[in-house]
């Protein structure tokens, strides 16, 4: 399953959301959701514990000027890669 976070993690119930993630699920952060990938943020431990497949849209990361502060647990991908994730995952949840 693909879990997509588009809003800031401060506007989302991360405890509930991370409880829904399985280790094999794909997690993608885009738009303001990329803030969840910042090093040392309060949500990082919950999300890295919940899923092994963590992605952020690199265009959104660079647009916010945070590319040097992204956790190494996350893989930067393009919007084309995002399309491939949607093809891979028949089920999706947007948070």
Curated annotation (Swiss-Prot):
GO biological process: tRNA wobble position uridine thiolation
Classification via InterPro entries: DsrEFH-like, Sulphur_relay_TusB, Sulphur_relay_TusB/DsrH
One Pfam family recorded for the sequence: DsrH
Localization, UniProt: Cytoplasm
Broad class of the protein's primary localization: cytoplasm
Keywords, in A-Z order: Cytoplasm, tRNA processing
GO cellular component: sulfurtransferase complex
Coiled-coil regions, chain positions: none
Binding partners and assembly: Heterohexamer, formed by a dimer of trimers. The hexameric TusBCD complex contains 2 copies each of TusB, TusC and TusD. The TusBCD complex interacts with TusE.
Family per similarity comment: Belongs to the DsrH/TusB family.
Role this protein plays: Part of a sulfur-relay system required for 2-thiolation of 5-methylaminomethyl-2-thiouridine (mnm(5)s(2)U) at tRNA wobble positions.
PANTHER family, alphabetized: PROTEIN TUSB
The name this protein goes by in its record: Protein TusB
